[in-house]
């Protein structure tokens, strides 16, 4: 059965990387994610990843606690770079070739973001991990995922979370919450379902770039989404 999506932008939240912990990186979770990514690479799918940093530092919370918002956001971008390096190292150990590109210049550690090079890496079947969000304060890593998805000519943005889709309310807090199989962008925005922030949703809607929200912890879920099976929640125009 052929894949439905040839090139994907995978958004990994920092919270997903810490697993059941409250801080930091769960190595077993990172290894699981790498195995899932390796599985779709074997199908010929090209993979770009945007990673968050909330497992290490939450800029908006720190700004709310009195820290300067711009400073807090830059610290959050550095946290995403740490996560990107952890993913890169896990991929190396599992035989997956990857490159890390950062929207902030840290040349001794990672490459700067250059769209042409990133596209070439994808053509060469290398995984590209994007760090530091958009490189600008006040923009979330969800918005970075939408932006990089468009720049990389991705067929879909896949948001990997701890739950298996979008629900009427938080299923971890409300056992009666119902999962949506699919939604339009306008429905997701009007219902304020917290799929992604409004900027990211609007960007994807305007560029007709679909989104799927799924659980990265379900073994094989990523592959099922790629194959077009009923997995997660699809958001489309």
Swiss-Prot record:
| E.C. no | 2.7.4.22
Q: Does the record carry ATP-binding as a key word? A: yes
Residues holding ATP: 11-14, 54, 58, 161, 167, 170
- Cited Gene3D superfamilies: Acetylglutamate kinase-like
Subcellular location per UniProt equals: Cytoplasm
SUPFAM superfamilies in the record = Carbamate kinase-like (SSF53633)
Q: Binding of UMP: at which residues?
A: 53, 73, 134-141
Q: So where does this one cross the membrane?
A: none
User: What reaction is this protein's catalytic activity?
Assistant: UMP + ATP = UDP + ADP
Q: Which CDD domains match?
A: AAK_UMPK-PyrH-Ec
User: What quaternary structure, including any partners, is listed in this protein's UniProt entry?
Assistant: Homohexamer.
Outline what the protein does: Catalyzes the reversible phosphorylation of UMP to UDP.
Q: What is this protein called?
A: Uridylate kinase
């Amino acid at each position: 059965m052929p894949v439905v999506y040839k090139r994907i932008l995978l958004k990994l939240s920092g919270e997903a990387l810490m697993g059941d912990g409250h801080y930091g990186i769960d190595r077993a979770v990172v290894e699981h994610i790498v195995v899932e990514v390796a599985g779709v690479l074997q199908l010929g799918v090209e993979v770009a990843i945007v990673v968050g940093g909330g497992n290490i530092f939450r800029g908006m919370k720190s700004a709310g606690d009195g820290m300067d918002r711009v400073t807090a956001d830059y610290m959050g971008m550095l946290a995403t770079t740490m996560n990107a390096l952890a993913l890169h190292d896990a991929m190396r150990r599992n035989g997956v070739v990857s490159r890390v590109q950062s929207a902030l210049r840290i040349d001794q550690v990672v490459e700067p973001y250059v769209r042409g090079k990133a596209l070439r890496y994808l053509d060469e079947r290398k995984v590209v991990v994007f760090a530091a969000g958009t490189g600008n304060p006040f923009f979330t890593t969800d918005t970075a995922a939408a932006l990089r998805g468009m720049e990389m000519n991705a067929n879909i943005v896949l948001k990997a979370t701890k739950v298996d889709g979008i629900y009427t309310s938080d299923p971890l807090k409300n056992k009666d919450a119902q999962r949506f199989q699919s939604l339009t962008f306008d429905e997701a925005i009007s219902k304020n379902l917290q799929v992604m922030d409004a900027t990211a949703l609007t960007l994807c809607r305007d560029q007709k770039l679909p989104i799927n929200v799924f659980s990265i912890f379900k073994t094989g879920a990523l592959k099922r989404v790629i194959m077009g099976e009923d997995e997660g929640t699809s958001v489309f125009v």
